[in-house]
Amino acid sequence: MSELVTLPRLLLRNAKDFGRRTAIREKDRGIWQSYTWAEYLAHVRDFALGLAALGFERGDRLSVIGDNRPRLYWAQMAAQCLGGASVPVYQDSLGKELAYVWNHADVATIVAEDQEQVDKILALRDQLPMLRLVVYDDPRGMLHYRHDWLKSFADVEALGREFAKTHPDSFEAAIEAGKADDLAFICYTSGTTGSPKGAMLTHANAIETAKIAGAIEKYRPEDEYLAYLPMACVGDAFYTLVLSLYAGFAVNCPESPETVQRDLRELGPTLLLAPPRIWENMLTAVQVKGTDAPPLKRRVFETFRRAAEQAEILRADGKPVPLGLRMLRALGEFFVYGPVRDQLGLRRVRTALTGGAPLGPDTFRFFRSIGVNLKQVYGCTEVTGLTSLQPDGEANPTTAGRPCPGIEVRIAERGEVLVKGPGVFKGYLKDDAATQEVIDAHGWFHSGDAGFIDPHGHLVIIDRAKDCGVTSRGEPFAPQFIENKLKFSPYIREVVAFGHERPFVVAMIAIDINTVGSWAERRGIPYTSYMDLSQKPEVRGLIREEIRKGNETLPEGTRVRRFLLLTKDLEADDAEMTRTRKVRRRFVAEKYAPVIDAFYGGRDEVELSTEITYEDGRQAALKSRVRIEDVEEEMATRG
């Protein structure tokens, strides 16, 4: 076999070198089912040859939709073996979003998890002229579906075994024909300002970035990774397909999104990649359990927690940890930290990464203090998910880590972060103009993020460059920076801040229904719905105090002066967020224009009318009068 320049060649290598070692598991009906690298290859070979028998050709695109399942990963690899590219999509996307991606990418084959996903495709079939084949994984409920272009995964594999009898060397020949600059993935960006763009990632992008990550983190075949992120997320593709193939470690698919936390505890992986919300939810669970504990246990927990966090702050500042604190830390490992890690499923984790948005300093320090090697990572789809990473011993809640070896980072004149390296993508599918806007003549990718390099050589991200502005009083205004400060509160799920060319900063806030609901129940405050809870005077008071805490960490001129609690969460289905939960600012500003006018018009309440979209596409309107609150009640002026 020639050089390992494509992912399929890595698969052949793994089947040869690690044939009997577990490659992937899935939990089905409470039981973990394991597949070795040899079995992984056999399934990929059979499915790839089945696709070939059905007309799949080099350059074709295959899409997958559903939860994390081995057969959906095998399908992506099978397409790549034949010289095609995989196009993963978000399974909770609306029909019009799916149709856009599948048509834009010229998808000819879709592999769906189950009946629910097949039904979505059936509803769109007339809108998908390029579609030739739909394959389903789970046969439950599919018995009476009769279409020539619809087949089960098992049926396609059976076709592949028959095809192999007359084309015995075609699979290996197809892999051998693959080149490093062939497309491996088309990952669609979140589309904060318009339709999502298809970022084209090659095998070279994937493998060279894996080499960089592997040199830093020393991934090994014995590692275990839990695959629960949406398959359309570049982080999932990079870990479950690229890094797993590169390093040979095992990927584990949970039973369902609802069982992830339970499966995490049961599995105890050694590697974990999680967005801030996951870490915040785990910390909240620990805090709630601590609140319900007997007084003695609660005091013991708080004593050791404070000791661990003090030690972590000293360590992060490069200061020595006193002997007494070290001894208390050692005792805490036995009585508190170890049991907490075990309860969360983190006892065996040796590398834990968080990215996509800043993680609150208190949350970051908590996990570091209980012995979790939690570090920040920064990247985006267009650079194959990796730009900078915090090395061991340099973890810090305020930075995105050092630029990785082999990846160059430069700060442009206006503060934009520029990136050059082997992970920089090939371009946007069918959009040369957009590609030229972000990749300059010298090969630098213009990230669109504003940031700087701190005195220690770490990258610090402030906000999206296009969102940065100034207030009418000349104060720098970075909405995401302000929003993240407030979202460090466990009671606040989403924030949208306004203030560009305005006299002061205001914010629309969506509460976290779980933590605020628990807070209300402990205080005997009854509520019937999200809307009812969000408008309780007590809840407005709670959020006011949380904003005050956040304001203490902000410059005087950018502190939030007025706020409003939304009567519903911000949702991707309502076009307020992307599927990766990034605010679509332009749309939100237009939708909530009357609210913004009320903020700056000095009004104390506003008529809030919002449309909500259900999973089946139906829409309904919510209307209510909502109070606008001043953060400081004694504030007499609005300007």
Which stretches of residues belong to each language-model region?
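Conserved AMP-binding A3 loop
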Residues: 34-38, 176, 184-210
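Conserved C-terminal "lid"/linker of ANL adenylate-forming enzymes
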Residues: 494-496, 544-638
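Conserved ATP-binding/catalytic segment of the ANL
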Residues: 54, 189, 403-471, 488
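Conserved AMP-binding/adenylation subdomain of ANL enzymes
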Residues: 207-224, 231-337, 348, 373
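Conserved ATP-dependent adenylate/AMP-binding module captured primarily in the ANL superfamily
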Residues: 93-123, 209-226, 257-271, 343
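Conserved AMP-binding/adenylate-forming core of the ANL superfamily
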Residues: 3, 20, 24-69, 73-77, ...
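Conserved pre-ATP/AMP-binding loop-to-beta segment of ANL
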Residues: 19-22, 135-136, 151-188, 195, ...
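Structural core segment of the AMP-binding/adenylate-forming
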Residues: 12, 49, 81-159, 542
